[in-house]
């Protein structure tokens, strides 16, 4: 992603364009699926994902000027770099937007989220969200247990969730770690 301060809703490709493979996102702890948003109420794949990952709570949120109270303030808050102490799970039922996430070198990667895309950002990962130029997304928000959506704006490197995330990022599964 480029470093331009231009409209946050634009794609912000680097020049020349650079596309990040899903394997790279997986290395950062991001999980994603492509599901059928037109039949989400009866989607067996969604049910299996929710059961396997313990996503017991869900709601649906329309993000657009006409439907979201205090729209401008909320969009500004979504785009402030932050982390959560729990996973952030979003399933795009309509519309589109971007999650910007930090890689291991603290560089931004822009992840497009479109209709049918479900994404899980790990706890402790710095990120931000913005709509694209369509200015609309209808998203299912999923949580383990009661919903907690507390953003910790950067810097909050002292939080256990951040330390655990960095440990996983720097010491991938299968790599030897020092005994304590």
Curated annotation (Swiss-Prot):
Binding site for Fe(2+): 82, 84, 88, 127
Protein name listed in UniProt: Acireductone dioxygenase 1
Cofactors: Fe(2+); Ni(2+)
Pfam families given in the database record: ARD
GO MF, one example: acireductone dioxygenase [iron(II)-requiring] activity
CDD domains hit by this protein: cupin_ARD
Binding site for Ni(2+): 82, 84, 88, 127
Reactions mediated catalytically: 1,2-dihydroxy-5-(methylsulfanyl)pent-1-en-3-one + O2 = 4-methylsulfanyl-2-oxobutanoate + formate + 2 H(+); 1,2-dihydroxy-5-(methylsulfanyl)pent-1-en-3-one + O2 = 3-(methylsulfanyl)propanoate + CO + formate + 2 H(+)
Subcellular location: Cytoplasm; Nucleus
SUPFAM superfamilies given in the database record: RmlC-like cupins
A single GO cellular-component term on record: nucleus
Function description: Catalyzes 2 different reactions between oxygen and the acireductone 1,2-dihydroxy-3-keto-5-methylthiopentene (DHK-MTPene) depending upon the metal bound in the active site. Fe-containing acireductone dioxygenase (Fe-ARD) produces formate and 2-keto-4-methylthiobutyrate (KMTB), the alpha-ketoacid precursor of methionine in the methionine recycle pathway. Ni-containing acireductone dioxygenase (Ni-ARD) produces methylthiopropionate, carbon monoxide and formate, and does not lie on the methionine recycle pathway.
Similarity comment: family membership: Belongs to the acireductone dioxygenase (ARD) family.
């Amino acid at each position: 992603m480029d470093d331009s301060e231009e409209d946050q809703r634009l794609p912000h490709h680097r020049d020349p364009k650079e596309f990040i493979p899903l394997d790279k996102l997986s290395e950062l702890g991001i999980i994603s699926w492509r599901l059928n948003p037109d039949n989400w109420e009866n989607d067996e794949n969604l049910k299996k994902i929710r059961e396997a990952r313990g996503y017991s709570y869900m709601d649906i949120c329309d993000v657009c000027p006409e439907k979201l109270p205090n729209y401008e303030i909320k969009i500004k808050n979504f785009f402030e770099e932050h982390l959560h102490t729990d996973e952030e799970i979003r399933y795009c039922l309509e519309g589109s937007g971007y999650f910007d996430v930090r890689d291991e070198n603290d560089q931004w990667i822009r992840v497009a989220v479109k209709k049918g895309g479900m994404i899980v950002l790990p706890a402790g990962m710095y990120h931000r969200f913005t709509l694209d130029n369509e200015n609309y997304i209808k998203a299912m928000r999923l949580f383990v247990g009661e919903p907690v959506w507390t953003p910790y704006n950067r810097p909050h490197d002292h939080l256990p969730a951040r330390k655990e995330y960095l440990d996983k990022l720097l010491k991938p599964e299968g790599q030897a770690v020092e005994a304590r």
